Amino acid sequence: MDTVGQYLMENPEEALRLDVKTDPGAVRSQALLCGIGPGARVLDGGCGSGKTTAVLCEMVQPGGSAVGVDFAEDRVRFAKKTYGDTPGIEFALMDLRSPLNALGSFDFVWIRFVLEYYLEGAREMVENVSRVLKPGGRICLLDLDYNCLNHYPIEPAMESVIHALVRRMMEKYNFDPYAGRKLYTHLYDLGFDDIEVHLVPHHLIYGELKESDDFNWFKKLEMASSKARDVFDGYPGGYETFRKDFRQVFNHPRRFTYSPLIIVTGRKPS
């Protein structure tokens, strides 16, 4: 079976996971770094639950608007139900790999935590979405580097399984744990001007574990492990023991986990 075109995290609770994990304050800070402000028309590509679209829409008031697009009917339905009454917002069922001209043109195109699911095809997606960006408009790419890989302290056997699981997701499900480091080069190669790069922490987990982080990380583990259960065969006790051991480590306030977020923005030539 060809799994490269499948979304790694696809499951009935994905809209909820995305909604729970999205921090409006972090979105605002990141959008300010990209220059998003009042009066702009913004495309939120891969909008998921619509929560980020709603934050962006709030930031472009007065006079602005935001359009969120996603290829999953259930997520667009969730977004419309939860955030569709926000003035200036709309949601559409569309694939970022397909023509987007029907949406019109935008001052900003925002692509956050999408390219990590496109080890193959990320650059082509960026090129496609840039076609609806106005001349002089800015594209905003935001993604993680070393995604899910940085935990301390952790036993070598557990770390080995995590790395093997991530490799399997790369090989079979088009996942890219190093998407962040590639964003600048995407824009450079596509001829964008005035490229700016910012590096900030995203996952920065220490001390007591937040309920939202617990839900997000164990939903990730559940989804990835369901696609590669054999990866756990070499771990003493198999998957169930690994899950129990990882929960014990991850819930301990001594644990330190982080993932860097790379933000790259560039101006489309006039």
What is each of the regions a protein language model found here?
Residues 2-25:
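Class I SAM-dependent methyltransferase Rossmann-like catalytic core
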Residues 4, 13-14, 198-255:
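C-terminal helical/coil "lid" or tail adjacent to the Rossmann-like core of SAM-dependent
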Residues 61, 118-119, 133-135:
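Helix-to-beta-strand junctions that scaffold the AdoMet/dcAdoMet cofactor pocket
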Residues 123-138:
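A short glycine-rich, Lys/Arg-flanked "PGG" loop and its adjoining helix->strand segment in the class I
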